[in-house]
């Protein structure tokens, strides 16, 4: 994935019928980067963390309606340790409801590899940090960039007090050598091995999608997605 991604996530929600006068749209900015991938942790701390802070604190200070999502307890810990002044600004914006703690884990989880206990502890340590530092808790599993999601995920999430899950990675199944099975649904309820259920966005679309500056009010594509699920909602990366 890119070294740093600024995603615009838009959620279009219709009360019952998808029509222009009953649609509500939320545009929320989000930054996502791996703690380490084709770079080391030191580079994340030295370069990617301050870029995320500088860009988004500027936008928060400039535009009163700007809101921002960011995930990963370990990244917040780095902010606290290496950028304490900006960290205090983050805490203020969290109190104001403009900086949202996304996800609930200490760092991005790979549900294909760890044991159930390691997955649960990842949530436990992340939530403990968020409660101690910000007085809030995450409500979801946020994994835009993971290569598979086991049937145990809804069960672990539900037993951890979480209510949601989202990803864009299932669209990779349509690429060569990744299989041809279809994505189960865009938005709906995902039931785990023990019958526990959470709200799930199975297809948030590619996080490098380009918006062509078009009016989406009458988009048949978005209408079809909204009408295909009981919430009449669309969750889409731009």
Regions flagged by a language model, labelled:
Residues 20-238:
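Catalytic-domain carbohydrate-binding cleft regions of carbohydrate-active enzymes
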């Amino acid at each position: 994935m890119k070294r740093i991604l600024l995603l615009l996530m838009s959620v279009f929600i219709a009360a019952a019928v998808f029509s222009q006068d009953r649609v509500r749209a939320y545009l929320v900015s989000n930054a996502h980067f791996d703690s380490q991938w084709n770079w080391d942790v030191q580079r994340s701390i030295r370069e990617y963390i301050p870029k995320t802070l500088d860009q988004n604190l500027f936008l928060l200070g400039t535009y009163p309606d700007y809101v921002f999502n960011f995930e990963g307890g370990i990244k917040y810990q780095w902010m606290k340790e290496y950028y304490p002044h900006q960290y205090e600004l983050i805490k203020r914006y969290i109190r104001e409801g403009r900086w949202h703690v996304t996800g609930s884990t200490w760092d991005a989880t790979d549900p294909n590899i760890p044991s159930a206990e390691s997955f649960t502890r990842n949530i436990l340590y992340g939530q403990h940090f968020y409660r101690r530092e910000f007085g809030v808790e995450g409500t979801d599993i946020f994994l835009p960039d993971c290569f598979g999601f086991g049937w145990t995920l809804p069960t672990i999430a539900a037993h951890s007090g979480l209510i949601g899950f989202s990803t864009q990675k299932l669209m990779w199944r349509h690429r060569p050598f990744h299989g041809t099975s279809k994505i189960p649904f865009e938005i709906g309820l995902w039931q785990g091995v023990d019958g526990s259920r959470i709200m799930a966005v199975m297809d948030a679309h590619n996080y490098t999608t380009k918006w062509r500056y078009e009016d989406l009010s009458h988009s048949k594509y978005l209408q079809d997605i909204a009408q295909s699920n009981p919430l009449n909602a669309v969750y889409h990366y731009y």
